[in-house]
């Protein structure tokens, strides 16, 4: 009887819990079908059980994982609200929503956007990487405009710096000669870096533009002039160097800083005097009457003759040894106004070299008061030179001690050579 068997099969599928009750009455109905009936009911029961088990598995998967996540500890709590997080980076990212911090900046040129999350930055970077996007084209235009503005700034800086270098061409001709002829004329390293920086910015003829360039500091002009004067005049041969160094065509600011250049290189070359070889000492002896810097290595010989620093302070006593100091009396007559202008403004800023120039300018004028200084210096005995000496050099020594600059070696040699070593006892 096929219809009852089919009905029993559908009922097993729809109602699996009635498998036992339905299967027992079906067996007496047809005894010939008994071998096939258990197999059909077993297959139907397996299918029903599989169908009945599928919904709980599909429905219970997500709640089970959620329960596990809820059971995990949340040690990272937000200090500004009640939320807690499993991981530290999640807490950090959440705190940025309170503080407004945006540490992730776009690296595309011209783009100034910042983001608090790295995934937002990654999503934003795709805008720049996509060439078909309108925003990427706009960003490229902004970047090009920013680059053009930066290029204009650089061009303005280059044009401003290019206004001075054309006069610096004569210096390139004289610089190799000065390096070969007189290597120890270079000042200490700090001053060389400072002076080279000033020289590149101001140029060799900066002393002629003092009155025109009112915006520049006169101290910087004096520094550049001193460096230029050394590079120009010490690099030529002996004869023209003497005439160009003391010709009346020089301005006061160009001539007077040579004292500072001489003072600095005087101390430095005195320290290097023991390192000279025979070939270089020959060049020093050849240029001694004309080069004020090269007279410094032979200063110990002057100190034995009681004339060591006297070319700096009493030019009447040593006209033959130091021709550089002889025209300083005429310089006071030529341009006194420029000299006083440089005197008043150079001590305002205190680089190394313009500071001690004040006492040096007045010391030659003090030496011109009485010709008795030459008579006193010509006396071989130191005891005869004791009493009159503090009248003139005492003021110069005090003026040199007041600035506290790099003239300590010169002042000590002055006290020993002029006063016979006991100048400090009379103070």
From Swiss-Prot:
Main location, first listed in the record: nucleus
Pfam families: zf-C2H2
Free-text description of this protein's post-translational modifications in UniProt: Ubiquitinated. Deubiquitinated by creB, probably to control its activity or amount.
Domain of life: Eukaryota
Zinc fingers (C2H2-type) by residue: 76-98, 104-128
Region (Disordered): 1-70, 117-140, 164-185, 269-333, 348-388, 404-427
UniProt keyword terms in alphabetical order: DNA-binding, Metal-binding, Nucleus, Repeat, Repressor, Transcription, Transcription regulation, Ubl conjugation, Zinc, Zinc-finger
Gene Ontology terms: cellular component: cytoplasm; nucleus
Gene Ontology process terms (BP): carbon catabolite repression of transcription from RNA polymerase II promoter by glucose; regulation of carbon utilization; regulation of gene expression
Listed Basic and acidic residues bias regions: 272-281
Location in or out of the cell: Nucleus
Annotated InterPro entries: creA/MIG_C2H2-ZnF, Znf_C2H2_sf, Znf_C2H2_type
Low complexity composition-biased segments: 15-52, 289-303, 404-419
GO molecular function annotation: DNA-binding transcription factor activity; RNA polymerase II cis-regulatory region sequence-specific DNA binding; zinc ion binding
Summary of the function given for this chain in its UniProt record: Transcription regulator component of the regulatory network controlling carbon source utilization through ubiquitination and deubiquitination involving creA, creB, creC, creD and acrB. Represses the transcription of the alcR, alcA and aldA genes by binding to a GC-rich region in their promoter. Also plays a role in response to carbon starvation and the control of extracellular proteases activity.
Family the UniProt entry places it in: Belongs to the creA/MIG C2H2-type zinc-finger protein family.
PANTHER family: REGULATORY PROTEIN MIG1-RELATED
UniProt subunit comment: Interacts with creB.
Designated name of the protein: Probable DNA-binding protein creA
Lineage per the UniProt record: Eukaryota, Fungi, Dikarya, Ascomycota, Pezizomycotina
């Amino acid at each position: 009887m096929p219809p009852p068997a089919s009905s029993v099969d559908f009922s097993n599928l729809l109602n699996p819990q009635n498998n036992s009750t339905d299967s027992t009455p079906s067996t007496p109905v047809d005894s010939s079908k008994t071998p096939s009936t258990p197999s059909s009911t077993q297959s139907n029961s397996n299918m029903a059980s599989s169908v009945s088990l599928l919904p709980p598995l599909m429905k219970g998967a997500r709640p089970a994982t959620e329960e596990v996540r809820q059971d995990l500890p949340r040690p990272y709590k937000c200090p500004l609200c009640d939320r807690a997080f499993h991981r530290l980076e999640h807490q950090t990212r959440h705190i940025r929503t309170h503080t407004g911090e945006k540490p992730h900046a776009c690296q595309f040129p011209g783009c100034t956007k910042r983001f608090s999350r790295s995934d937002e930055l990654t999503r934003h970077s795709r805008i720049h990487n996509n060439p078909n996007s309108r925003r990427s084209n706009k960003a490229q235009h902004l970047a090009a405009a920013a680059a053009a503005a930066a290029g204009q700034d650089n061009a303005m800086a280059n044009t401003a710096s290019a206004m001075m270098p054309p006069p610096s061409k004569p210096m390139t001709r004289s610089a190799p000669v000065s390096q070969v002829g007189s290597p120890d004329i270079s000042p200490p390293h700090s001053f060389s870096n400072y002076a080279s920086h000033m020289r590149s910015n101001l140029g060799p003829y900066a002393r002629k533009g003092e009155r025109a360039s009112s915006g520049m500091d006169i101290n910087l002009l004096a520094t550049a002039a001193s460096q230029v004067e050394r590079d120009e005049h010490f690099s030529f041969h002996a004869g023209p160097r003497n005439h160009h160094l003391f010709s009346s065509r020089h301005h006061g600011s160009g001539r007077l800083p040579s004292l500072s250049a001489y003072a600095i290189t005087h101390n430095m070359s005195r320290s290097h005097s023991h390192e000279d070889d025979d070939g270089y000492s020959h060049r020093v002896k050849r240029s001694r009457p004309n080069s004020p810097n090269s007279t410094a290595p032979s200063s110990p010989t002057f100190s034995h003759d009681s004339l060591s620093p006297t070319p700096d302070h009493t030019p009447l006593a040593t006209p033959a040894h130091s021709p550089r100091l002889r025209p300083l009396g005429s310089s006071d007559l030529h341009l006194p106004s420029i000299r006083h202008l440089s005197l008043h403004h150079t001590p305002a800023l205190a680089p190394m070299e313009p500071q001690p120039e004040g006492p040096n300018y007045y010391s030659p004028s003090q030496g011109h008061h009485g010709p008795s200084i030459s008579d006193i210096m010509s006396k071989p005995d130191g005891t005869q030179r004791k009493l009159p000496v503090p009248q003139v050099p005492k003021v110069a020594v005090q003026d040199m001690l007041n600035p506290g600059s790099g003239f300590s070696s010169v002042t000590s040699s002055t006290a020993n050579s002029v006063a016979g070593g006991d100048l400090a006892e009379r103070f």
